[in-house]
Amino acid sequence: MLTKEFAQRVELSEKQVRKIVQHLEERGYQLSKTEYRGREATDFKEEDIELFKDIADKVKQTNSYDLAFDELEKEKDFLQVIVKNDDKNLPTNQNVAQLVEDLRLEIQKMREERHLLGQMMNQVHQQQQELKELQNQLTSKIDSNSESLKAIQTSQEAIQEAQASQAKVLAESTNKVEKNAVTEDKADSKDSKVAGVNTSTDAKTDTKADNAGDGTTTKVDKEDQISATEAIEKASVEQSKNGNAAETSNKEATIDAEAQHDAEQQVAEAHAEASKQATSNDSLEAKAENDSTASQSEMSEPKPQEEKKGFFARLFNL
């Protein structure tokens, strides 16, 4: 029977039948041939129906013609299944052993190739795993670098904030120092005024002592000088206190106002003391002039020397 009729018998398409015939002929199996419309065609027999059905079932299971034929070769002897009982198609006794050996070698070669293919697939799978690991490592490194960059940016911002705060503190310190310098200049000017007052007081005392012209006025002059010297020393002490207060105000800016108030109060006290001394000097000058007049009129009558009086005794006429 021809291909179309045989395909209907085995319930396959003509294309599938031709494909099976091609694989059988490539493996050295020969089917019966006939001539149809001037061309050679396969002449299928009744016994071929079972063979083609078995091959079609294996192809469906393996989804491959090559694998189907390999399994069928293991299950049964194809030489006895598909070789026809035709003497012209049977090999000679001399070639049977060689043919079987060739087939065995071919099958072994195919198995080796399949094993190599499996190894190559395993290598490819292993390389894919390595590539995934490398990708994960790169991702982790990128993440760590990103975190490092964020940390660096944060530290830079902190440094900038610290620099800004330091500059602010420095500016405030500079302003405080300038204020303290102004306060110190004011204290120095006030101290110089006090020194001027003391100097004028000393000048008045010296002038009045020169006008007295006798021993009594000289004693008064010395005592006045001692009192003036004490006032000057007191003013110097007050000035040094003012200087110390100014220096302390440079270190402790919060007590500048109190130190300045104390310095002004001390200067006022020194000025009041100087005024008292000037007043007492004027009274002593008047008394010395009276004593000088009395001594000139009574030069011929010596009098016993009176007891030396102190500054405060003379001041209160004791």
From Swiss-Prot:
Per the record, the domain of life is Bacteria
| Ranges annotated as biased composition (Polar residues) | 237-248
Annotated region described as Disordered, given as residue ranges: 172-318
Coiled-coil residues: 67-157
- The signal peptide, as residue positions, is none
In its keyword annotation, does this UniProt entry include Transcription? Answer: no
Feature: compositional bias, Basic and acidic residues? 175-193, 219-236, 249-274, 300-310
Q: Keywords in UniProt for this one?
A: Coiled coil
List the protein's name: Uncharacterized protein MW0361
Q: Which species does the entry assign this protein to?
A: Staphylococcus aureus (strain MW2)
